[in-house]
Amino acid sequence: MTTAGSCGRNGGFMVSIKEVAKHAGVAISTVSKVLNGYPNVSEETKKKVQDAIKELNYIPNSIAAALSSKQFGRIALVLDPNRQTQAIDQIFMQYLVGALDKAKELNVEVVTIFPSMIAGMTAEEITRSFLSQSISGVVIYGMSKEDKVLQKLIREKQFACVVVDAPIVNSRTTSISIDQEQAQYDVAKKTVLDDNCKRVLHIAGRRDGYVTDQRLKGMKRLVKDLDLTMMVRQGDFSELTARNVALKYAKNKDVVVCASDLMAIGAMNALIDMDIFRPVCGFDGITLMGYVGKQMNTIRQDFYSISSRAVEEVHQLMNGGEGHQVIMPHSIVKMYYKDIIC
């Protein structure tokens, strides 16, 4: 717990927790409670303390020690296993193993941060928490467009950041992804031309996803280039939702283009249940596609390599590198059972 002995700097002078308390007009114990995330502090009081901390540039002893120690240089991996279902845990594990292997190679320590661990925290609170853990680099996987807190954390440039699948770049932030727009265009074009399709049902991902917008942009370009018609429905990257969309709309379409493999599996099973054939394509290249029975085109992403490169990039930023955009390769494949069995 942060105590009265904590200190910071303001224009070269040490700032004590006592001065923060005085500036905010609260007790020292109240400042300590805010710093340590105690729940029994009103929002009004919390704001007073946070404003005082910011104005005085107060840094607790635990953070100051981390800043000056040789341990300062850990990398936080911000990723959410709960955003996946058990069917595509493969993506989460490939991200994790890719990051851990590269971190071992670079001799840096990584810390896994799940969203539940920082839920409800402000950008300032996350900053203090990360600094207290000697974190100076952050890799964020699949950030939502609605996540204003993490976006603020990136804008403030306190940490070297790499964002996976989000087009955000600044002097201390690198973006890494495949070319989502082109990949969606490529796999949909092949599927459409293979079966001479004209009427497209596109099952898109979550509305708050950066990749959803990029993949939809690819589809709109394809529709224009090939003079197609297209109906777009949200599938939320859910197998069940995509199944229900296909049951309702696929019968009157020539092809079903899905923005993820899991949704493609849901759509294909809906078509099988309706006893009709429509070509379906997915996106990601997960192993589960090989078990469906009906082979579908998909985009293969190398999640291991993407995550490994993300850690390499954040390490470069931590050592003075400049933020930039990294485009990783993709390929169109069909997943066959004989190719995935061990």
Model-derived segments and spans:
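Short beta-strand elements in bilobed, periplasmic/extracellular small-molecule ligand-binding domains
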Residues: 103-115, 202, 220-241
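Alpha-helical recognition/docking segments in bacterial nutrient-uptake
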Residues: 2-12, 74-189, 249-251, 255
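Hydrophobic alpha-helical segments within soluble ligand-binding/sensing domains
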Residues: 176-202, 239-247, 264, 301-319
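Short, well-ordered beta-strand segments
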Residues: 76-78, 201, 257, 281
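An alpha-beta-alpha
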Residues: 187-226, 322-340
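Flexible loop/turn connectors
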Residues: 251-342
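N-terminal helix-turn-helix DNA-binding module of bacterial transcription factors
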Residues: 1-73
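Alpha-helix capping/helix-boundary segments
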Residues: 145-146, 208, 215, 262-264
